[in-house]
Regions:
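Glycine-rich, low-complexity intrinsically disordered segments
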Residues: 21-169
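Bacterial N-terminal signal peptides
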Residues: 4-19
Length: 169
């Protein structure tokens, strides 16, 4: 049994841990709270200064079926799950923790997705949000935390075509 050490080993680990489609994208978030103001999250990449680098995101909005699983007419209210971002522990960890424990309103969470060439192609914008949950995990490839945001309004923007859709809950 051999142990691979160094950058090449990390690259191989990243390739085996992340699904192929995830490797094609990068993501950052701009976060502005009501009392703390814009969070300076430490990204130093040119044009992305102060943003939060993300490792992943997930969200879900469901329209339940009136007849339960398996079909039928849609019935009932939309079921909206929090948007969850995965990030490393960093300088934005304490302000997000304070936002959670103080129930601080978050004016804006703007998630920007970039393709493999670094072109900003999609934006998810949350307004009037709250940090609903923070969970931390220690894994073999590092320390990460999941931050779940509930929100009043969401906007989806295709930056290439200009198409957008929004909804208030």
């Amino acid at each position: 049994m051999s142990v691979v050490i160094g950058a090449m080993g990390f690259a191989l680990l990243a390739l085996t841990v992340l699904p192929a489609p995830a490797l094609a994208y990068s993501m950052v978030a701009v976060i502005e709270t009501q009392t703390q103001g814009p969070l300076a999250c430490g990204n130093t990449a040119r044009g992305l200064e102060g943003t939060q680098t993300l490792l992943g995101i997930s969200d879900e909005i469901l329209l339940p079926s009136a007849e339960g699983a398996g079909g039928g007419d849609p019935g009932g209210a939309l079921q909206v799950r929090p948007v969850v971002v995965i990030k490393e522990l960093d300088r934005c960890t304490p302000p997000l923790f304070l936002a959670l424990v103080n129930r601080e309103r978050i004016r804006l969470v703007e998630i920007r997705l970039f393709d493999r060439q670094g072109v900003h192609f999609f934006t998810i914008r949350l307004e009037d949000a709250l940090v609903a949950r923070i969970s931390r995990q220690v894994r073999s490839h590092g320390l990460h935390e999941e931050v779940a945001f509930t929100y009043r309004a969401i906007q989806l923007i295709d930056e290439r075509s200009g198409a957008s859709a929004s909804h208030q809950f």
